[in-house]
Amino acid sequence: MSLLKIYWRAMQYLAVERTATITMCVASVLVALVTLAEPVLFGRVIQSISDKGDIFSPLLMWAALGGFNIMAAVFVARGADRLAHRRRLGVMIDSYERLITMPLAWHQKRGTSNALHTLIRATDSLFTLWLEFMRQHLTTVVALATLIPVAMTMDMRMSLVLIVLGVIYVMIGQLVMRKTKDGQAAVEKHHHKLFEHVSDTISNVSVVQSYNRIASETQALRDYAKNLENAQFPVLNWWALASGLNRMASTFSMVVVLVLGAYFVTKGQMRVGDVIAFIGFAQLMIGRLDQISAFINQTVTARAKLEEFFQMEDATADRQEPENVADLNDVKGDIVFDNVTYEFPNSGQGVYDVSFEVKPGQTVAIVGPTGAGKTTLINLLQRVFDPAAGRIMIDGTDTRTVSRRSLRHAIATVFQDAGLFNRSVEDNIRVGRANATHEEVHAAAKAAAAHDFILAKSEGYDTFVGERGSQLSGGERQRLAIARAILKDSPILVLDEATSALDVETEEKVTQAVDELSHNRTTFIIAHRLSTVRSADLVLFMDKGHLVESGSFNELAERGGRFSDLLRAGGLKLEDKQPKQPVVEGSNVMPFPVKGAVA
């Protein structure tokens, strides 16, 4: 994007507060006009002194304009600061809301630290541009646009000096912009790398300390900082050169104005007051051109940050759902995967032609080796990704035709990583349902076998759990996650080995709670331990993205296929605890021929 396009798009964010923005612009224009009038009045004062005429009137007018200029400048500074601060927070909140509504696949591809860094640096750059626009940029443009015509009405020859000065500044600015464009983009990439390293290290500080990586990680940060310096310094050199050239041009112009003015006065072709006015014009123009140079520097520096931010904004805007998209209401829990295929880009992994049906209230256990596609199936159900082929239907409705909000409302998930916020215990449980009463929160905690350990904490339900639940044990974190799902009370439940972090006694309690929770709900269990799938109505054995076997636990156990091999490898007895059950005719599993599948 060109600098003007970047600048124009940045200014468009001010349109939300149109009245305040217009008020600031009008006030800025008045400040610019008053500033331009001051050299003219000062010249008249000097001319009156030289002519021994009336000095009181021009002096009084000059003082009045000066006082008005001070008050207007204070008004603009105060209003611009407040407006820029409000819009920075507003843009940050709006962008944040769009970011957290983006599918998980988008976040996984982009990276959390990258999106966060882009948002923070871009909003800071926008704040600076908005503030400078209302304080200086607009007044500078108005002053320069009116200064030359006013000067030309006084003396064309002296005006040419000012015009040449402006042309020189423009040429220097274009040269520096051309030379620093790629360099500034490289600087921004190095900033991202440095920030990502810091974020990655701090988020894994326990590993850093445990493996004594403090010195090596710090050295890596020094290397990133050195690379950033090496990219930044050439850019800074060009701007330093531009500053020197601009200063040389302005000094030379001032000397020319003085010499020409003195010459024209001695020849009787100009008055002393007019020369003084042109000296004021030259000083005003030099100051404004310096502001233009600083403005170009700011915009060039912000260019890479804002381009990336605008791309992120466009990406999130493109993924926003239409306002009239239908909601998924009154969910019963009948779920069909119909020849569903999805492959991760450039990986060769995914799921392929998966078909099965789950009746309302049934429990489905998904098993298989690592990388088999178990989690991918659940992600497809929740529309983390959309199928490349086939369709997923809930109660006969394609999930792609309903709003993500209503779909997420219908599904409660207990992740293997509990995913707790750095908030109180009650706030973390209340994530399941924000408007739940204290009694409902406590009831959910009791059902998840969490109530007793919560009350044992010094502050009970008001206890802060730390970042990602760092102040709790693994079992405590998992029980809060289960309580959250219980409180959400959704018709579809997803359990990613929800009891894996619990001790035997607690697991028995939580398993009972989970059984109660899954009663009359369609439940998916991503199983890493086969002991958790015995009570499932349907077992899906995944391998390399294909649904290799499907059926009841006992049916697959007796089939002698891959699932049976996995049972034996786990050391479980097939007849232990569960009597043999006959295979029910009219299975709800849709026939699916897979090459190489065990029959």
From Swiss-Prot:
EC number(s) from the headed UniProt entry: 7.5.2.3
InterPro entries tied to this protein: AAA+_ATPase, ABC1_TM_dom, ABC1_TM_sf, ABC_transporter-like_ATP-bd, ABC_transporter-like_CS, NdvA, P-loop_NTPase, Type_1_exporter
Family: Belongs to the ABC transporter superfamily. Beta-(1-->2)glucan exporter (TC 3.A.1.108.1) family.
SMART domains noted in UniProt: AAA
Domain of life: Bacteria
Catalytically driven reaction(s): [(1->2)-beta-D-glucosyl](n)(in) + ATP + H2O = [(1->2)-beta-D-glucosyl](n)(out) + ADP + phosphate + H(+)
Name of this protein: Beta-(1-->2)glucan export ATP-binding/permease protein NdvA
Residues annotated as domain ABC transporter: 335-569
Quaternary assembly: Homodimer.
Any one Gene Ontology cellular component term annotated for this protein: plasma membrane
MF annotations from Gene Ontology: ABC-type beta-glucan transporter activity; ATP binding; ATP hydrolysis activity; ATPase-coupled lipid transmembrane transporter activity
Key words, A-Z: ATP-binding, Cell inner membrane, Cell membrane, Membrane, Nucleotide-binding, Sugar transport, Translocase, Transmembrane, Transmembrane helix, Transport
Species: Brucella abortus (strain 2308)
